[in-house]
């Protein structure tokens, strides 16, 4: 039943199918639910989970040491007061955008190819936002006072500075996380009921039963589910654009050369979707191989995601060219120097590496043979993730290191604690993700069933 990636099953139109033929409602349900309920935990789950757990311990150690010693353990100093922490914050927030785009925008556009990938993409969004939220809190120096960011009654009658984009970040990211969590949970409810009905373990049955909230599959339940899904999709859709736009305001309202640019909002949004789809591919390709899901996550899914990655990559490439052109055309010596410093300054290798990763290498995606080659696609996705991290690093560190006054110039070098904190959040992300795929259906059971020919309805009569 599994699809051969070198010879994918096609429909008469010549396009690969969204689900391999031969499946029934029962076989789809059995295949996905068995990963959680009946299969023994495989070795290929334990090994990466233990690695992720080790990296999580590194993160906890780094955070504990930071709380004791302060942010001075990082490499930040005047003039580079934003280092890896804010770089990682922007990078993780960007990764989460693909999950919201897949689950919300593609739902509103009635794109059925989302059905096999939206569940774990939404989980990816939540875990990425959780990792992103760590860095601004730790960067405060006194993270236990984070509630000062929120307007609350206090004896001093002091309120946050609502004209600061850092405050906008708090509300944008918290709203994004809340809506994404609600959307993810609402989509899980029908499948949680399926696991409840199939679970043999009493505790598992009780847990899934509580989470399913009394779902019985009645027509009224489905009607309310559809209404809630569309409402949440409508709420989440503008968040795809607004969250990274607000994050870009952290830079655009500043007068730092290389930051004060109107191109940043669309540039940041495109880059977020670019890196987000790269992460979805990094997760989808091993998952379909390890769990034998090639018949549910087909080459058509991978090809479509590669096309989205190519399209957003072209927008990012245009932004790079336009950014350099505006610096030259403006005639502003500080803007021209900022761009020249990126290309030839002490951080020039970083800049040219990001140009290769984000602009040059992904052009191979124009060829279908590359888009449908699993190994190339996986390498390309890792390349984009690296390139987008380097882009944030160049924007933040390189711009701050040399601004207006040469006597104030300084250089940033990360410490072992910068590295430990960043690598630790990668461990946190995969720790949560591996727990998710072991305890929840990573693919939406009921939505994949709608892709079957048996689910089609003609003139009001089900086939």
Model-derived features: where do they sit?
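Extramembrane terminal tails and long inter-domain/linker segments of multi-pass membrane proteins
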Residues: 1-44, 147-161, 191-227, 300, ...
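Transmembrane-helix bundle segments that line or gate the permeation/cavity pathway
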Residues: 2-23, 64-74, 79-82, 89-219, ...
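Long, contiguous internal "core" modules enriched in hydrophobic/ aromatic residues
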Residues: 34, 38-65, 154-354, 450
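Hydrophobic alpha-helical transmembrane segments
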Residues: 93-101, 353-362, 428-429
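Extended C-terminal subregions enriched in glycine
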Residues: 349-374
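Central hydrophobic cores of alpha-helical transmembrane segments
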Residues: 376-386
């Amino acid at each position: 039943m599994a699809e051969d990636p070198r010879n994918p099953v096609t429909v008469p139109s010549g396009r690969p199918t969204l689900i391999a033929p031969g499946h029934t409602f029962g076989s789809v349900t059995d295949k996905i639910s068995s990963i959680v309920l009946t299969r023994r935990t495989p070795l290929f789950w334990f090994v990466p989970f233990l690695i992720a757990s080790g990296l999580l311990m590194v993160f906890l150690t780094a955070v504990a040491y930071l709380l004791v010693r302060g942010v001075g353990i990082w490499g930040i100093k005047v003039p580079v007061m934003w280092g890896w922490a804010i770089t990682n914050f922007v990078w993780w927030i960007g990764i989460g955008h693909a999950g919201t785009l897949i689950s919300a925008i593609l739902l509103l556009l009635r794109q059925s190819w989302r059905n096999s990938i939206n569940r774990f993409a939404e989980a990816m969004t939540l875990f990425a936002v959780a990792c992103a939220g760590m860095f601004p809190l730790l960067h405060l120096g006194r993270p236990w006072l984070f509630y000062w960011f929120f307007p609350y009654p206090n004896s001093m009658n002091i309120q946050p500075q609502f004209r600061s984009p850092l405050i906008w970040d708090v509300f944008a990211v918290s709203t994004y996380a809340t809506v994404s969590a609600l959307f993810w949970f609402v989509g899980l409810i029908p499948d949680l009921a399926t696991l409840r009905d199939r679970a043999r373990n009493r505790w598992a049955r009780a847990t899934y039963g509580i989470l399913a909230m009394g779902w019985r599959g009645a027509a009224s339940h489905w009607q309310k589910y559809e209404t809630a899904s569309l409402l949440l999709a409508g709420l989440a859709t503008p968040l795809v654009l607004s969250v990274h736009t607000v994050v870009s305001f952290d830079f655009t309202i500043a007068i730092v050369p290389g930051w004060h640019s109107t191109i940043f909002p669309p540039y940041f949004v495109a880059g977020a979707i670019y890196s987000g789809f790269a992460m979805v591919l990094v997760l989808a390709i091993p998952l379909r191989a390890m769990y034998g899901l090639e018949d549910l996550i087909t080459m058509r899914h991978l090809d479509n995601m590669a096309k989205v990655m190519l399209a957003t990559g072209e927008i990012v490439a245009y932004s790079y060219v336009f950014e350099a052109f505006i610096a030259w055309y403006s005639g502003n010596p500080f803007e021209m120097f900022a761009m020249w410093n990126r290309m030839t300054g002490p951080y020039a290798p970083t800049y040219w590496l990001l140009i290769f990763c984000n602009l040059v290498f992904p052009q191979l995606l124009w060829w279908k043979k590359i888009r449908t080659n699993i190994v190339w696609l996986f390498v390309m996705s890792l390349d984009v993730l690296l390139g987008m991290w380097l882009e944030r690093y160049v924007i933040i560190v390189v711009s701050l290191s040399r601004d207006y006054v040469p006597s104030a110039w300084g250089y940033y070098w990360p410490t072992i604690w910068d590295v430990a904190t960043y690598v630790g959040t990668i461990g946190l992300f995969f720790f949560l993700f591996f727990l998710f795929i072991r305890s929840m259906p990573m693919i939406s059971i009921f939505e994949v069933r709608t892709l079957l020919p048996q689910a089609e309805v003609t003139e009001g009569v089900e086939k």
